[in-house]
């Protein structure tokens, strides 16, 4: 990339065995930023018509947690600019991405649904949240909940999944068994 004169950002997929290792290799070749995560065009199958249907499924806030996890991990191991794409629909979603380490968010589905004026709502929602928490800038909040700085970093790890399942198992004993 020595001949490239503009900053290059790579939009990643979540399908890497070791996302931090892959991002490190990108950093070594001169990439300046990464965005988590690219969404794929995913046609579906219509069982009645027996045909493949084109669909465009907008993102929802349910898409955000996967990206937050990646940001929380990458922001501890990379100096690259980190972007978040997918699942950002409110100022609070922007704040979540920043807390996990994002420098930028990309918004499409929310704008398709609400129009360009929605950008002002995202901005005002973020500013309101920052002010309410005592942050003067988004830079002050960036990475506060990443893997190294979160009050309980294990919440980002697989061990938390195991603890969650154990809690579910404990609750399942409340049920009457036949």
What is each model feature region?
Residues 1-83, 89-105, 151-178:
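Alpha/beta enzyme core
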Residues 104-114:
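Helical hairpin unit composed of two closely spaced alpha helices linked by a short loop
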Residues 85-86, 114:
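Small/polar loops that bind or transfer phosphate-bearing groups
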């Amino acid at each position: 990339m020595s001949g490239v004169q503009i900053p290059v950002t790579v939009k990643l997929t979540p399908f890497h065995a070791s996302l931090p290792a892959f991002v490190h290799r990108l950093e070594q070749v001169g990439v300046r930023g990464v965005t988590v995560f690219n969404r794929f065009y995913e046609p579906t199958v219509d069982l009645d018509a027996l045909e493949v249907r084109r669909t465009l499924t907008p993102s929802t806030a349910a898409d955000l947690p996967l990206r937050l996890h990646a940001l929380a991990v990458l922001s501890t191991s990379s100096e690259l600019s980190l972007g978040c794409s997918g699942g950002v629909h409110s100022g609070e979603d922007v704040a979540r991405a920043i807390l996990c380490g994002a420098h930028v968010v990309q918004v499409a589905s929310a704008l398709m649904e609400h129009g360009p004026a929605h950008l002002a709502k995202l901005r005002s929602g973020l500013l309101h949240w920052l002010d309410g928490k005592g942050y003067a800038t988004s830079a002050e909040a960036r990475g506060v909940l990443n893997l190294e700085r979160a009050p309980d970093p294990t919440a980002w790890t697989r061990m938390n999944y195991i603890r969650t399942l154990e809690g579910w198992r404990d609750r399942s004993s409340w049920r009457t068994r036949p």
